[in-house]
């Protein structure tokens, strides 16, 4: 039967991609349905209880700048905050937070339930309803059908999910949840390229059975950083410590002895696992020369005794898990509350997606999250927001909302996926971005909030706060440029005390702040030069923009040069064999990837600058050159 109401946007799956997708569509005014197999697991942290990190923290800030949920949710649920790379430049500094997974999940659910235009319904999705290569709705496990003008698939690891513990395996989307078998089978009959990936998780331990006195304590930063541009330290719950211990040779021997019963090393698991989050079996095999590996002992929350031993993800049999865990210092009497496991699942080749995350084969159908071959909550949330926004734009008959590699890590993420695809779970790093100095955590709102406002993602309160900040930055920078300090200033001794070399001639306050050793806040404490503005976000911008102005300008020039052909469109279904001079290999790669623009074509592995030149000449000669709007 058909449900009596129809929807603008239907989102299938309530994980990190699904929550951001449904909230984005609803914020933009679309009547949105979030379809989940279990309302109680909305926003569930299936693996590690943490948000952020190198590259990932940048994505969270960008989600927040566009009005998304993840940053606010972690600010209200994190039990430890740290700034990574704090001694390095602002481009690679990253925020990471340890979450209370119960608080996080509750905050997400509460936000979803109170979002205008959003309805939540509990039923697994078993099929997509198509008409003439266009999705028009979905069908659930009990046969109930929902009409939708656009559909976003955010099904995570649930498609034909297979959980492995030793040589035993069973169907599941994650421990305790059923796999999505029927939907996976239906989608295999559609024109999508599919493959299998694998990820894993460590056993969980009871903290009461551990000896923390022999471990290294790792406290959070004080004062603690804040993720959301709208947040404050007052949002944070109680802060507690994590701990560090290590594996040893005895641990490694237990693992080696169990490899003959490992699903990874006996060929039972076919999917490729995450390169940057390897299992402990992989670590001791690939890095056989290392006598120990670090383990971060991370509390799962304030009201539970469970801890997450980050660094020993495994799918070894349970008896081997027991032996390897109890061989670790501080874990000698450990009680395992949940076994570690690996999970294999279906994913779709993201090269079959447009930059908007819409399928190239089925109109109005969008994909986001692990279904596209990524790993991580942050990568999923970023894709979910973009997919949800574009599903809404499709309903409203608006242009697609896409971001370039020079605009956001979101742009880098989606461009990498849609252009290059992936054969292993894709994780974001700052090293993947060419324009890191422009794509900092601190300026995510400056880069994106105005764009989010234009399409309806950003509400009035955030928009007002953003404009106040920008006004503060501009007025203060004008003051710093126009305020001059003479070398006989009454406080010259205090000024020179901040400088490596004393002032030899007059200088503006801006000139002084450009010096690497000078801190804006310290300089403003000197009588007659300040006071510093109270807005800490604005003062951070003032310092970074002033100190790095030359480098930023050079990077902007570089972007302008590269953009000349970046946005040149390639006609759909273009026949590359028409171009004489292209090798068969190049033609095959271009046909396989179907790049939408010259920029995307240039980033395909094996496509040479000479091939791009031939393509440009042909398009120009035949009057096919045109830019994206």
UniProtKB/Swiss-Prot annotation:
Pfam families: GIDA, GIDA_C_1st, SAM_GIDA_C
Disulphide bonds in the chain: none
UniProt binding sites for NAD(+): 273-287
Cofactor names: FAD
GO CC annotation terms, alphabetical: cytosol
Residue sites binding FAD per the record: 13-18
InterPro entries: FAD/NAD-bd_sf, GIDA_C_N, MnmG, MnmG-rel, MnmG-rel_CS, MnmG_C, MnmG_C_subdom, MnmG_C_subdom_sf
A molecular function (GO) term: flavin adenine dinucleotide binding
Listed GO biological process terms: tRNA methylation; tRNA wobble uridine modification
The entry's keywords: Cytoplasm, FAD, Flavoprotein, NAD, tRNA processing
Keyword hit for RNA-binding: no
Task performed by this protein: NAD-binding protein involved in the addition of a carboxymethylaminomethyl (cmnm) group at the wobble position (U34) of certain tRNAs, forming tRNA-cmnm(5)s(2)U34.
Subunit structure comment from the entry: Homodimer. Heterotetramer of two MnmE and two MnmG subunits.
Assigned protein family: Belongs to the MnmG family.
Protein name: tRNA uridine 5-carboxymethylaminomethyl modification enzyme MnmG
Organism: Colwellia psychrerythraea (strain 34H / ATCC BAA-681) (Vibrio psychroerythus)
């Amino acid at each position: 039967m058909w449900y009596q109401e129809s929807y603008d946007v239907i989102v299938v799956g309530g994980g990190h991609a699904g929550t951001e997708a449904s909230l984005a569509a609803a914020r933009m005014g679309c009547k949105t349905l979030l379809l989940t197999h279990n309302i109680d697991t909305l926003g569930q942290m299936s693996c590690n209880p943490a948000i952020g990190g190198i590259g990932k923290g940048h994505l969270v800030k960008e989600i927040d700048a566009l009005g998304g949920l993840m940053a606010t949710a972690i600010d209200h649920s994190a039990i430890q905050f740290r700034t990574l790379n704090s001694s390095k430049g602002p481009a690679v500094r990253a925020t990471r937070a340890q979450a209370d997974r119960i608080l996080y999940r509750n905050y997400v659910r509460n936000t979803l339930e109170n979002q205008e235009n959003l309805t939540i319904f509990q039923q697994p999705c078993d099929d997509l309803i198509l008409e003439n290569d266009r999705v028009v709705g979905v069908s659930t496990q009990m046969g109930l059908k929902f009409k939708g003008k656009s559909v976003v698939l955010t099904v995570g690891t649930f498609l034909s999910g297979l959980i492995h513990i030793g040589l035993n395996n069973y169907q599941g989307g994650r421990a305790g949840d059923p796999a999505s078998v029927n939907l996976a089978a239906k989608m295999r009959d559609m024109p999508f390229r599919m493959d299998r990936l694998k990820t894993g998780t460590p056993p969980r331990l009871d903290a009461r059975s551990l000896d923390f006195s022999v471990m290294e304590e790792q406290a959070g930063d004080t004062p603690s950083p804040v993720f959301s541009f709208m947040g404050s330290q007052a949002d944070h719950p109680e802060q507690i410590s994590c701990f560090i211990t290590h594996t040893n040779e005895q641990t490694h021997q237990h693992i080696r002895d169990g490899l003959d019963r490992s699903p990874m090393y006996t060929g039972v698991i076919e999917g490729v696992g995450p390169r940057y989050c390897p299992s402990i079996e992989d670590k001791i095999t690939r890095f056989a020369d290392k006598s120990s590996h670090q383990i971060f002992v991370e509390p799962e929350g304030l009201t539970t005794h469970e801890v997450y031993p980050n660094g020993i993800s495994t799918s070894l049999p349970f008896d081997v898990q027991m032996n390897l865990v109890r061989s670790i210092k501080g874990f000698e009497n450990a009680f395992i509350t949940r076994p570690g496991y690996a999970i294999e699942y279906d994913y779709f080749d993201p090269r079959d997606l447009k930059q908007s995350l819409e399928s190239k084969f089925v109109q109005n159908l969008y994909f986001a999250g692990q279904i596209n071959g990524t790993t991580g909550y942050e990568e999923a949330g970023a894709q979910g927001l973009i997919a949800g926004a574009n599903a809404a734009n499709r309903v409203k008959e608006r242009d697609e909302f896409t971001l370039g590699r020079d605009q956001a890590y979101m742009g880098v993420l989606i461009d990498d996926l849609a252009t290059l695809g992936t054969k292993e779970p894709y994780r974001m790093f700052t090293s993947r971005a060419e324009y890191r100095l422009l794509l900092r955590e601190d300026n995510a709102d400056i880069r994106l909030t105005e764009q989010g406002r234009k399409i309806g993602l950003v509400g009035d309160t955030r928009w007002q706060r953003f404009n106040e900040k920008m006004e503060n930055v501009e007025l203060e920078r004008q003051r710093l440029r126009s305020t001059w300090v003479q070398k006989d200033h009454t406080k010259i001794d205090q000024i020179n005390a901040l400088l490596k070399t004393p002032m030899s001639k007059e200088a503006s306050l801006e000139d002084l702040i450009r010096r690497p050793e000078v801190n804006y806040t310290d300089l403003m404490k000197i009588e007659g030069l300040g006071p510093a503005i109270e807005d800490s976000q604005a003062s951070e911008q003032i310092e970074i923009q002033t100190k790095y102005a030359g480098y930023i300008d050079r990077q902007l020039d570089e972007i302008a040069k590269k953009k000349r052909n970046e946005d040149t469109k390639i006609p759909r279904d273009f026949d590359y064999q028409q171009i004489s001079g292209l090798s068969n290999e190049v033609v095959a790669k271009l046909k396989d990837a179907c790049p939408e623009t010259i920029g995307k074509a240039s980033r395909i592995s094996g496509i040479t600058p000479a091939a791009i030149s031939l393509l440009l000449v042909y398009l120009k000669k035949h009057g096919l050159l045109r830019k994206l709007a």
